[in-house]
């Protein structure tokens, strides 16, 4: 038994230890000391991070020495004892198990332990056989195992081979052979990026990378420590095709350079500021929100883009790929081969980033005439950063990729206009060569084409790769404006320049030789374009129809029901435009509207002529013989200012007497509408309703349709008119042809003074009031004839007598093409129009002469009498006490009258039918410039059958007017000479449209009128054959004008007349003084009414002329009921017209 034990112990001793009785002499202390020194030198070569693990290894060696020495002493003479003590059955087995466990944990490493080191460790462990000796290694087993594991890794031969490979690849760029197809931008091991921070360093200082084992939890935790995101990089997913996950620094830099820096000279070539470049790189590393929209240094952004590609641990362009591309550059179809090499040799993320970058470089090179950066210069700047090689062939490869970008990458880049300094990358770019933008999907090898007008930033619509091959209906979307580019402050924001959308894609088959577009796609494109063209044509037709309907709505509204009065909506834009067209505006304001309205009015010209013929037929048979009552004829403006007074009588007395007389008359209500201004004496007293009324310049633009109360002076005028008409016979019988009572009218202006001695001749009442105005219903605007006689006599302005254009005319512009040219050239050139000039009203004198009436005449049919109320024109010289918008609105009355007197007679007649829309004018202007300071007019009765033309601003749609000018020079016995120039404008129509009145009472007086006219011409030593010819005609379209020795004459109204007492007022016009006069039968010069108003007030008459055409005198007008058209709804309202 003992021998067996000895054998067993000896066997264990010799199997686990190198010591034997024959080797005792060799084991000395010197050998042990050498081994200890070798062990310390080996430990000094370890990494500094593992210094704390050196102590266990040293302790193990010391224990190994102590145990070795003790075993030697014990075994020196007592073999059986040592064998028994050192032959513990558990100790070798336990140590073997520990070594096996250690080897299992280190399986993740790529190397194995050295044999010498294993033998030494086994010796050191096996020699601790004595149970009595203390073993210091037993308490520190775990640190010793870690130390042993690090020793194995350091001495591993396989890692040395890897170090050599890394040294070679860093020099030649061959490390790309270890990369995968998809470049992992988000994971880069720190031993490559940060040197020795994550790995251990050998004696040569090279970096050693660690291999990872997914089965080991310790190795996975250690691998996380060695991994981090590379800066500026974000993970690239499958949706990179939409450029949503491109690294932010590339995306923002390229967008900024595309937008602002394509024309910057030396972009990418000039060096950037190092401090600013460092600051930008730190901002991107922090990952905060960065806004480059207001950044001003383009070279720093270009330098940042180059810095990103240069500092990448792995080049984005593989070295071996560039060699293969270089080998096929000189071959045929090199572009197709290069494209195939890029698709096969690059990952998806790499291809999209390079395409995004080379798009910018190609756009820069296109504008090389401005920025001086051609293909060669750009290749020199980017080749070292993209390929990371000093091989000169890389420059040729990058240059070819930039130059042939369209055929290689399949994306179109715009040509930037040299006149601008900014190229917007967010715009839809024009297609070069008729091609459109493409995106390449590497999985199914299809190219998706985007139309240049259909580029959207809907990145979510094409996240899947299969969506690129699906086709959808083609649609055109409008190009965004250049100012609509979004700011680049969003992390994932990208310009829609290259973004794809499935709704605009068309599949294209890829072949190895060329990109063939299928016939089906071409047919679809043609069909879609045809459909779009048809849709556009239909839309244009619809828009034109709508515009025509809107234009026709104004004219067709005349034919609507005329049984009720409707007020236009507040702020009516349609009527506001009509007001502008009829007002005296500069020609540049209304040229566009005139052109449009000329086309519209010309279309309805034939219908108007038919209605005019029908109107004249009805008017000839509708002469009324009723008694003098209030007429429902709408007053265009106030007649309060026409109150006359006898010569030499105080104005205040007349004003008070008229008030007393008017208070006695019954007050009648009317549906008329007019605008009144409060009298200066009645301000604040609550008497605004009965005050006199006038208008202002600013009211020309306003449609004032408020009912007001007419002042009581109208009734007084009616009463005086009746009295004057009763006295007409007596005055006519008492006055001879040569002895006529004279009335002196003095007209005072700013620089001129005119004195007219008028000797009126009055006919009997039967000759005066025999016919009424022609008022017949028409669905279209009725023709209106107006006349104005402006007698001007200047002493200090000889230039005003040079041409008729220098005279004052109160004609206003109309939308008609026939009249707009002649009126603008002759009358509107002298108008200095001030849009917001208020009406100047005198505060001191509240009587009637302070109120102005625009130039117009209206014929009022009252019973069997037809009388005319004249209107005059004047300019105010005193400031106004009222703002144009502070006018009181009252209710009107149903009477329209004109003032008449026995000493001076004025008559004007109009054939007016008030319509809601304006019509062109029939005007006749007579301008006279006299060289004498005083004139005397002695006239005889003229024939009654003359055409009378009144002046108004109610327009008429008729052809181009005929202008006739007659000039006569006469000499009187008072040695005063005068030159009379008359211009008459009439409009010829197929049927008579002038207001020539047919009356049986005048048929017997034609011969007498001709004789009187001939006598008058003989007395003046002047023969006017035109007058005789005009008087012999019943329907004449031009007025008969007879010039006297010292004063001009006025057109004569043949039928209706009223007589107004002579009076004089102070008047001032804008250019020259004027006095209007007209008479019936007898040649009368009206007293020069001094009215304070500007020239533009003549166009106010169309403002109130908005009543519908009556169906007939005996039907709609007999009962005193006024009907008005319904106003069309307007498109928009202006706040300026919403005046209460």
Swiss-Prot record:
This one is known as: Rho GTPase-activating protein gacF
Which residue positions does UniProt flag as site: Arginine finger?
Answer: 269
Organism of provenance: Dictyostelium discoideum (Social amoeba)
PROSITE patterns from the xrefs?
A: RHOGAP
Biological role: Rho GTPase-activating protein involved in the signal transduction pathway.
Q: Where is the Rho-GAP domain?
A: 234-409
List compositional bias (Low complexity) regions by residue number.
Answer: 10-26, 35-71, 83-136, 193-222, 456-475, 482-493, 520-533, 550-566, 607-631, 724-759, 797-822, 891-914, 952-1058, 1065-1079
Q: Name the UniProt key words of this record, in alphabetical order.
A: Coiled coil, Cytoplasm, GTPase activation
GO CC terms of this entry? cytoplasm
Single GO BP term = small GTPase-mediated signal transduction
InterPro entries the UniProt entry points to: Rho_GTPase_activation_prot (IPR008936), RhoGAP_dom (IPR000198)
Q: Where is the composition biased (Acidic residues)?
A: 534-549
Q: What does the record give as the organism's lineage? A: Eukaryota, Amoebozoa, Evosea, Eumycetozoa, Dictyostelia
Localization, per the record, is: Cytoplasm
């Amino acid at each position: 038994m003992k021998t067996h034990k000895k054998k067993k112990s000896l066997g264990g001793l010799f199997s686990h230890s190198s010591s034997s009785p024959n080797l005792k002499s060799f084991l000395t202390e010197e050998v042990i000391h050498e081994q200890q020194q070798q062990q310390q030198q080996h430990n000094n070569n370890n990494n500094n991070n593992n210094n704390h693990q050196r102590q266990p290894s040293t302790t193990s060696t010391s224990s190994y020495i102590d145990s070795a020495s003790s075993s030697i002493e014990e075994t020196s003479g007592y073999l059986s004892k040592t064998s028994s003590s050192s032959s513990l059955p558990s100790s070798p087995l336990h140590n073997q198990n520990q070594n096996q466990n250690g080897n299992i944990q280190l399986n993740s490493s790529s190397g194995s332990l050295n044999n010498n080191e294993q033998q030494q460790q086994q010796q050191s462990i096996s020699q601790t056989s004595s149970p009595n000796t203390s073993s210091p290694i037993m308490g520190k087993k775990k640190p010793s195992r870690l130390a042993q594991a690090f020793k194995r890794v350091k001495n591993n031969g396989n890692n040395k081979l890897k170090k050599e490979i890394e040294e070679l690849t860093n020099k030649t760029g061959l490390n790309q052979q270890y990369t995968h197809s998809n470049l992992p931008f988000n994971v880069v091991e720190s031993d490559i990026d940060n040197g020795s921070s994550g790995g251990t360093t050998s004696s040569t200082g090279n970096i050693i990378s660690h291999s990872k084992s997914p089965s080991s939890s310790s190795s996975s935790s250690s691998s996380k420590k060695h991994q981090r995101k590379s800066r500026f990089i974000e993970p690239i997913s499958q949706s990179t095709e939409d450029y949503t996950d491109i690294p932010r620094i590339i995306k923002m830099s390229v967008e900024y350079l595309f937008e602002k820096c394509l024309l910057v000279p030396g972009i990418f070539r000039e060096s950037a500021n190092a401090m600013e470049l460092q600051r930008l790189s730190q901002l991107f590393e922090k990952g905060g929100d960065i806004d480059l929209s207001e950044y001003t240094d383009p070279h720093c952004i270009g330098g940042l883009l180059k810095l990103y590609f240069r500092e990448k641990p792995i080049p984005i362009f593989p070295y071996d790929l560039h060699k293969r591309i270089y080998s096929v550059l000189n071959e045929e179809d090199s572009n197709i081969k290069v494209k195939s090499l890029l698709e096969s040799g690059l990952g998806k993320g790499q291809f999209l980033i390079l395409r995004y970058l080379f798009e910018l470089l190609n756009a820069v090179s296109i504008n090389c005439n401005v920025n001086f950066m051609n293909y060669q210069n750009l290749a020199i700047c980017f080749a070292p950063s993209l390929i990371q090689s000093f091989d000169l062939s890389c420059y040729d490869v990058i240059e070819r990729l930039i130059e042939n970008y369209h055929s290689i990458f399949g994306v179109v880049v715009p040509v930037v206009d040299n006149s601008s300094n900014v190229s917007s990358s967010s715009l839809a770019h024009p297609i070069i060569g008729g091609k459109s933008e493409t995106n390449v999907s590497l999985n199914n090898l299809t190219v998706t084409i985007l139309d240049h007008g259909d580029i959207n930033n809907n990145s979510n619509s094409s996240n899947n790769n299969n969506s690129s091959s699906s086709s959808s209906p083609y649609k055109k979307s409008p190009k965004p404006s250049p100012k609509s580019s979004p700011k680049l402050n969003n992390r994932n924001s990208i310009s829609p320049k290259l973004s794809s959308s499935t709704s605009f894609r068309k599949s294209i088959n890829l072949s190895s030789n060329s990109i063939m577009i299928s016939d089906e796609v071409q047919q679809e494109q043609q069909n879609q374009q045809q459909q779009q063209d048809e849709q556009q044509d239909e839309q244009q037709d619809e828009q034109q129809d709508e515009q025509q309907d809107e234009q026709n709505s104004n004219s067709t509204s005349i034919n609507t029901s005329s049984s009720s009065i409707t007020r236009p909506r507040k702020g009516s834009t349609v009527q506001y435009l009509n007001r502008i067209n009829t007002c005296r505006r500069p020609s540049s304001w209304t040229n566009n509207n005139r052109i449009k309205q000329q086309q519209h009015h010309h279309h309805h010209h034939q219908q108007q002529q038919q209605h005019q013929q029908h109107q004249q037929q009805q008017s000839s048979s509708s002469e009324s013989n009723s008694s003098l009552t209030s007429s429902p004829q709408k007053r265009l403006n106030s007649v309060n200012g026409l109150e006359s007074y006898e010569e030499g009588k105080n104005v205040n007395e007349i004003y008070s007497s008229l008030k007393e007389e008017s208070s006695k008359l019954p007050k009648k209500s009317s549906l008329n509408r007019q605008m009144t201004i409060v009298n200066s004496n009645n301000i604040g007293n609550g008497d605004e309703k009965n005050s006199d009324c006038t208008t202002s310049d600013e009211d020309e633009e306003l449609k004032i349709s408020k009912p007001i109360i007419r002042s009581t002076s109208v009734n007084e005028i009616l009463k005086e008119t009746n009295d004057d008409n009763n006295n007409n016979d007596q005055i006519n019988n008492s006055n001879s042809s040569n002895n006529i009572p004279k009335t002196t009218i003095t007209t005072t202006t700013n620089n001129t003074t005119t004195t007219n001695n008028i000797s009126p001749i009055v006919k009997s009442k039967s000759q005066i009031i025999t016919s009424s105005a022609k008022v017949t219903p028409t669905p279209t605007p009725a023709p209106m004839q107006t006349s104005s006689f402006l007698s001007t006599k200047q002493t200090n302005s000889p230039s005003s007598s040079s041409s008729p254009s220098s005279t004052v005319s109160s004609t206003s512009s109309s939308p008609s093409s026939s009249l707009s040219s002649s009126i603008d050239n002759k009358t509107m050139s002298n108008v200095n129009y001030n849009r917001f000039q208020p009406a100047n009203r005198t505060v001191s004198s509240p009587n009637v002469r302070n109120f102005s009436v625009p130039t117009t005449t209206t014929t009022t049919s009252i019973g069997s009498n037809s009388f005319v109320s004249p209107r005059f024109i004047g300019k105010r010289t005193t400031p106004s006490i009222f703002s144009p918008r502070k006018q009181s609105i009252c209710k009107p009355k149903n009477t329209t009258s004109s003032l008449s007197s026995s000493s001076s007679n004025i008559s004007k007649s109009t054939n007016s039918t008030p319509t809601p829309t304006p019509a062109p004018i029939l005007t006749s202007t007579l301008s006279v410039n006299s060289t004498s300071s005083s004139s005397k007019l002695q006239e005889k009765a003229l024939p009654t059958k003359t055409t009378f033309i009144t002046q108004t601003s109610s327009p008429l749609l008729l052809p181009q007017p005929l202008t006739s000018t007659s000039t006569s020079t006469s000499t009187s016995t008072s040695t005063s000479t005068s030159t009379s120039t008359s211009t008459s404008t009439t409009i010829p129509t197929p049927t008579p449209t002038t207001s020539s009145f047919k009356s049986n009472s005048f048929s017997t007086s034609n011969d007498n009128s001709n004789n009187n006219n001939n006598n008058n011409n003989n007395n003046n030593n002047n023969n006017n054959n035109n007058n005789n010819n005009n008087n012999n005609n019943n329907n004449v379209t031009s007025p008969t004008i007879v010039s006297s020795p010292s004063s001009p004459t006025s057109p004569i109204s043949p039928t209706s007349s009223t007589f107004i007492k002579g009076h004089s007022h102070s008047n001032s016009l804008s250019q020259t003084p004027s006095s209007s006069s007209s008479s019936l039968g007898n040649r009368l010069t009206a007293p020069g009414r001094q009215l304070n108003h500007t020239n533009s007030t003549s166009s106010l008459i169309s403002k109130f002329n908005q009543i519908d055409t009556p169906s007939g005198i005996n039907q709609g007008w007999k009962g005193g009921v006024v009907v008005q058209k319904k106003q069309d709804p307007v498109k928009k309202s202006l706040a300026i017209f919403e005046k209460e």
